[in-house]
């Protein structure tokens, strides 16, 4: 009781001292820094108090160990150490950081003798750091107003200077707007340069000048773009340098802050330790006086501790007996659980046997199912193969029918052609007879005219000389008439020769027609033989189909049987699933019981571990006390090292700050110059972009005018051509249609050429405009409107091109039909002559691309697939043109024949009139 009263007196003496220390530290921190730094330092004070409490704990433990040596090392002292350890952390963690000194008097009250030599050494050690502490405080007071004076260095922002902040904000704002403008400009350029250059009234006078002007503008624009890009790159490099400098500056500041905080913490700890040492010296002096009185009280306390220990031992024995009873109960539970586990194992074994039987049955069923499925697959394959054969046979039958029909049609067509040619041959014979009669009549008339002329000449010679002049005039007239008649006779002779040539041609065609008739008759005989064969094959195939139908019915019956077996299998599977569910429920019960058994075992192991932990904790507490003593010695050494390092770092920080300020000023000047250059370049770019847009608009308008003029002129030309064709050829609708097709094809070629001419303009217009710093809503709206108009124009062009493509496709189809009909009419052998065969042989000997066409192997190494395809296309185009020319020539020949007949009739009528006259 006396010891406790003494402890309370010591606590009342120590509390005001600790409060005064905290007030003194708070006053220093408030005078040195701003509000933000004061909050940080208050936190540091709290942390210091925590460190001090740990160090005081170590001091208290040292004192307690000394008292153990003095006293008789009883169990009472160990219990007091445990009480002290439980009290000390609570004092250190509270708001009053210095309240941890309350535990110290208890330790001092138990000390009997303190060695004098150790104490003097400790006092001398504490006097040495007192001088250094005062110096460090003075330096901190001088550095605090300097930090408050320059708020730029104390700022917590990433970018300290106003210039860097402005630059980064401009960079962030410019990037989004520049991206948007770049996208719109690229779309505008691709849309506006798509249309061709159009000049008003269809005249292309200033195209070269405009092209040169566009090239100049484009080159100037590219140069300015390059300069702008270089400036942007330099600006980015400068910004990166500024950011690196700022980051280095911030890192140095953070290091400075941390070091200043650590220095302040060390100063506070040093002050507290000095005060604590003084208090301990006072307490040691008082404790020496009180040691004699404490011997008596200690003996009484030892007796009380013995009594308490006996009571605790009784309580521990009771707890041990209770634990033994619980252990016996747990053993009984364990035995019961094992019995239940054995019963469950037996049940499990029976269920496993049932499961094995069921699995065996399942395997048998699965094997049966596999066999049935294999049979089913085999039958399905047979069925599918038979179906494929039947479909193939049906297709072959249909093909044969189609071939038969086509051959019948060809025979009929050949017969009709023969009849028509025979009729035409008869007509030509009649015409020949008529022409021969006409020729004889013309010869007789000519002889009569000659005789008349001779008579007239004789009469004129016998007449009088007075009428000689008149007769000369009449002679001249008659000579002119004779010359006219002679010309008419020569024309008639030429007509006669032409008719003879036509007769020879008709004879040749008649011979060719007869040859074709013979070949067609032989083909008809062959086709009849093939028809008989196909009928026999059809009968055979029908028999095969009937057999396959019977086989398919058998297979269907087997499939039904397999389906029934499959249903039985599914029912067996369902039963097996029910059994599996029952097995799972039983397994879950077994697992629950096993978990209960494991839980009981774990409880036993936990009780054993608890007893082991109690013994190990006592050993740990003794080892920790010795470790704390060594830590106190190490901390005193590290304090001196840290103070020297703090001084060195302070000097290095000052040098770095001066260098930073110089570099910041240089960078500011460079950034200002770059900004001025950038603004000038941006103004130039804006002016050029406006000029380019105006030129584009002018080009678009001129191209539109040019296109409209060209369309008008093409329409007028077409109308004039139509009028000319109508005047020259009255009834030539087919010629007009062919000319229209050619004009449409030529129009398509022109459209392609114009598209190819415009494509480089589109590619050149796809040069994207670089970033602009500002966005005008009016400009954006105008550009959107222009884009919409361009989109509408493109849609119109697409519709026109689709219509044009449809027309071209229809024309191609018509031409293919004409070509097919022409090829079907005439065989390839009749078209080629002997001269063409000789030419082919000559070409094949010479070698080259044409030689590879007429030989089986390629004669030229340069002949590739692409080249051969191009040659094929060109030849096809030539073939189409020649076919069209041949068709037109035939039609022209027919018209010429009709005109010749008309002229002959007209001549006969004139001759009859002259005879009548």
UniProtKB/Swiss-Prot annotation:
It comes from the Eukaryota. Residues 33-44, 722-736 have a biased composition (Basic and acidic residues). Residues 220-736, 778-822, 874-913 form a coiled coil. The lineage of its organism: Eukaryota, Metazoa, Chordata, Craniata, Vertebrata. Residues 737-748 have a biased composition (Low complexity). Signal peptide: none annotated. The modification Phosphoserine is found at residue 759. GO terms for biological process: glucose homeostasis; insulin secretion involved in cellular response to glucose stimulus; response to bacterium; vesicle cytoskeletal trafficking. This is Coiled-coil domain-containing protein 186. Residues 1-52, 97-118, 701-769 are annotated as: Disordered. GO terms for cellular component: Golgi apparatus. Keywords: Coiled coil, Phosphoprotein. Expressed in postnatal germ cells.
